[in-house]
Amino acid sequence: MSVNICELTYKEFSELVPHKVDTAILPIGTMEAHGCTNLGTDITIPEFIAREIAGKINALIAPTINYGITRSLLPYPGSMTVSQDSFIRYVGDVMESLFRAGFKKLVIINGHGGHIDELKKLAIEVWRKTGGKTVIIHWWELVEPMTREFFGEAGGHAGLDETAMVLAANPELVKPELCRDVIPYQFRAGTYVYPAAGPIILYKPGEGMPMFDLEKAKEYARKVVDLIADFIVVVFKGWEKNLAEKS
């Protein structure tokens, strides 16, 4: 039986939720320029992670939210956005609907830094309305120490970490030749630049440029998936033990 909710019949869903499966995974991304990877990089990575962790945490995967809040790279070709208000209302409605459908726990795999504050607010508000528990994974932040240990340097927007994950998910979506024509933008604290001065944004001087080693990318992706799954399991155990009487 499929782990994707949209591929189940309503009878199959009723047999699973919540008796056998009480957790849903919701990938969230946006459409945004990413150097030499696809415009949907922030979608591709959360969907890949969701597929890889579903079996590890006994979860079903909800349909992805593909449109998000794009800011600094919105002027670049192909970048798209929705308003902050629309995003909050829509994602909140989706979260509430998942809980009312029978899920008790929700894992949001977020692929875009522009959603961090909004998703935190939503997790709290939706809990107040439904009692549903949410864990939000900003994957690149959670795995940053491992990224530095694995590559010996930090990642960046459309940098080595995101490029490696897309490469592991679908090598055809990575176009190394495009990087030759891209001047990366080096972020500097104490400044604000709009629009961003490049579709590759580096946060540490001399660190984070994309890499294109497929085998190394696959190894990195495995570590990312394991780290995320392990963290979620710890959270679930904490909820089960410490909130059992309040659920």
Residue ranges and their predicted role:
Residues 1-85, 89-107, 113-247:
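Extended, histidine- and acidic-residue-enriched regions that form the cofactor-binding/catalytic faces
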